[in-house]
Each structure stands twice: as structure tokens, then as C-alpha cells.
Amino acid sequence: MSCLNLIKSVIVLIFLVPVLSYANQSQNVPYYGDDFYQDLKTGTSNIQLRERLKRIFNSVHQVRANGNDVIGPKGCKGECYQHTPTGYTAARVFLMGNFYLVKNGREYSVHDVYCDKDLSREDFKGAPPAPGRIPDNRVINVEHTWPQSRFTKRYSDEMQKSDLHHLFPTDSQLNSIRGNKIFGEVTQDLIDLKCSASRFGVGSAGSEEVFEPPQDHKGNVARALFYFAVRYEMEIDPQEEAVLRKWHREDPIDQEERVRNEEIFKAQKTRNPFIDFPELVERIANF
């Protein structure tokens, strides 16, 4: 092997090691417990899989050294945890004052996922982006990917409103335009939006108005809605679901989405299984 080829091989190995380490870790996440992994082996699907995930979401978890969590133990001993809502204010700080905050020298900007751009101090008349702060909501706000008007009564509004897995920072105007419309692929624009990354108009399946996010956010939207439907025992509109399944395939999970899932777990102690195990989408026939 030439010296140049050897150097190239070493460089490739350096970049592959962390990726492979993460891939191995994601295949054995203690959060899900032993029974879940048995379900994976036996091909559990549909209602049974949803019920398994619901139990994982709703139960107390007991941490087990060098093993998977004990799900719903009788009398928890040692280190235990369960889904703990952060509250909506803390959720907004997490997103816009932390995870999506970008440092540029001495200045900060915050990433808007609907226009797919970073908004800096110059874009704000009020409070600008800064660590641990919520910037001017007339410029950027938090989008509830599952609209608040469609929340279930089975769980508290506050739990659903502050669940970080379906929250993203978006341009306030586009947030308002999207409203509670379903997601879809636009065939005829009804409004010229301020940025071309997103579209609003007539959907490909008919006359219903739909909102179409940027290409590199479509898979994120799909997996957020799959999570929310299972977590809170709700159903996704069939027309919307067909598009979401397509987006899940076309915009696969990237490193940022994996890191976000980890950080959300640290903050509220729940994970999105459709990020950890994207193949689960194919095991559920109807969301």
C-alpha cells in the first residue's frame, strides 16, 4: 500500500469510528427495556407494537447497571425516572436559547427550520438570540408540529404543548400561515411565502390546503408526528400519513436529529423510537 493510500485509509477510519460507535449504541438503547428487544426479534407490529411503546412512554424506568431499563418495576429501587415535562417556557429556552443557537464570533443567531436560515441580531427589533434566552417572538417562535387545536384530552395540554419531540423554531409569519393545516406536497401555491424553502397551497391529493416544509426538514416532521401519534394515542390523517411515510424514506435521519433525540432525552426523559429505530415505521400499518 502506498503512503498516500495509507494516509487516506487512516483518515477514513478516524471519521468512521465515531459513526460506527453511535450506530452500535443506537441499536441497544437501555431506555426501551428487554421486552421491546424481544419484540424486535419476533416481529411484533401494529397495535401490539404501539401498546409496547405506550407502556415504555408512560411507565417509571429503573436503571439497571450494564443492562436495559426495567420498565414499570414494582417499587422502584435505585435510580429511577419517567417522562417529566419541562414546561413550555423551558422548552422554548431549550430550543432557541440552546439547541438551535448558533455562535458567530461574539454574536449569536438562531436557526429557523421553515426558511432554513439563521436569524441574527440584525433580524430582530426586540430581544435578539442569546444563550438561555427566548428571542423576540414576532420574528421567530416555536412551531407545534402537531397543532395544539388537535391535542387529545387523554393527556394534559401542558405535557403535549411542551413535548420537545414535536417542537421546532420557525419564522413567526410562516408558523401562523401553517396554523393547523396538515403537511403535504404543494402542487399549486396559494401564497407567496417570504422564503422559498417552504410552500403553502393545494396538496397533491386534492383540494385541501397543505403546508410543505423544506426538503431537509420533511423527515424530521414525519418522525415527530409518528412519535406524537403513538405517545398520545392519536391518529394521523390518512392523506397526511401517506406523504409522511414518503418523507421518512426520502429524508433519512441525520446526525443532528440523533443528537437532538439524545438531548431531549436528557431534558424530559423520553426518546423518539422512530429516530432510534427508523424501521419501526414499516411495522405500523396505520398511525
Protein language model annotation of sequence segments:
Residues 1-11:
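Bacterial N-terminal signal peptides that target proteins for export
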